[in-house]
């Protein structure tokens, strides 16, 4: 079930004489997909990562919260889905397009993340390949929306049909990627540890690793049980077998870089010679910049 809701936010700046000296209209379009009776995915062009909304008997659990300015539209949309209040926000990792909406949620909400993600959110360092830091909404909120509860390896929230299991298997997209499982619904939110079928973004500046990511993905696949559906970070849903294939894709990419180094190739030479294997024909590899950046990350790790 999909529907599109348009939520408009008009920002204006006026002088004392009521003349407008500047105004910006930002239209937030949220698309809602119902995966189960009580589980929804919220998407929105320009809004950042996919949001999961899990309606429990005690309240609503939200996984990730999109870019700056999207928190209130998310809250408004949730009100059309259920009268239950939001009690918990879980962040899969620290990137601004997954956590900035936190700032709009009440201070009664519990914010949960891996301990590394909390540290990354507090620092908000530039991502790998960029010089400017991301927008840090938490500076404006005096820390409101930062994680108030963290975990190291595994943690469970709720019980019975409302239970959520959180896992950490190691470095991947960042150094603190959380895997969020809804056992009763056989569904997992993987965040950007599984972007979708495309070349990954390895943010080494925030703990990501091109050397570790294949093992991390394989551990997730081999450890988590009874999951059929994966909510990806930015794409449509994936299957459990897709995760196994995603791990293989990243392992093959790593071995390709290792082989290139053994042959004495430079980063540019490895990048220009890489050809996507035919078994991954449906993977998006059109971003040559991402391919080169990931090769650079791996080469630096291997040195």
State what each model feature region is.
Residues 14-24, 222-227, 236-303:
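Accessory terminal helices/loops
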Residues 59-61, 67-69, 156, 163-252, ...:
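Metallo-beta-lactamase
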């Amino acid at each position: 079930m999909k529907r599109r809701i348009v939520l408009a936010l008009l920002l204006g700046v006026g002088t004392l004489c009521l003349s407008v000296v500047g105004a910006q209209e930002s239209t937030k379009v949220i698309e809602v997909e119902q995966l189960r009776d009580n589980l929804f995915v919220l998407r929105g062009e320009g809004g950042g990562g996919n949001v999961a909304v899990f309606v429990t008997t005690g309240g609503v659990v939200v996984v990730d919260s999109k870019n700056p300015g999207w928190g209130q539209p998310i809250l408004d949309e949730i009100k059309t889905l259920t009268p239950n209040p939001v009690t918990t926000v879980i962040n899969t990792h620290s990137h601004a397009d997954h956590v900035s909406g936190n700032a709009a949620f009440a201070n009664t909400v519990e914010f949960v993340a891996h301990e590394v993600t909390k540290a990354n959110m507090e620092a908000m360092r530039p991502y790998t390949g960029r010089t400017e830091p991301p927008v840090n909404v938490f500076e404006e909120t005096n820390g409101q929306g930062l994680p108030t509860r963290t975990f190291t390896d595994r943690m469970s929230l709720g019980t019975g049909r409302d239970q959520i299991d959180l896992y950490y298997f190691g470095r991947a997209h960042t150094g603190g990627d959380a895997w969020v499982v809804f056992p009763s619904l056989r569904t997992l939110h993987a965040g950007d540890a599984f972007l979708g079928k495309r070349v990954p973004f390895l943010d080494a500046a925030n703990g990501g690793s091109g050397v570790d990511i294949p093992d991390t993905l394989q551990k997730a696949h081999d450890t988590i049980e009874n999951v059929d559906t994966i909510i990806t970070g930015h794409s449509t849903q994936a299957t459990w077998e897709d995760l196994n294939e995603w791990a293989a894709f990243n392992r093959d990419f790593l071995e390709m870089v290792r082989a290139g180094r053994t042959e004495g190739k430079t980063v540019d030479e490895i990048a220009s010679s890489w050809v996507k294997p035919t078994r991954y024909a449906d993977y998006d590899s059109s971003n040559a910049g991402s391919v080169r950046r990931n090769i650079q990350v791996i080469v630096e790790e291997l040195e």
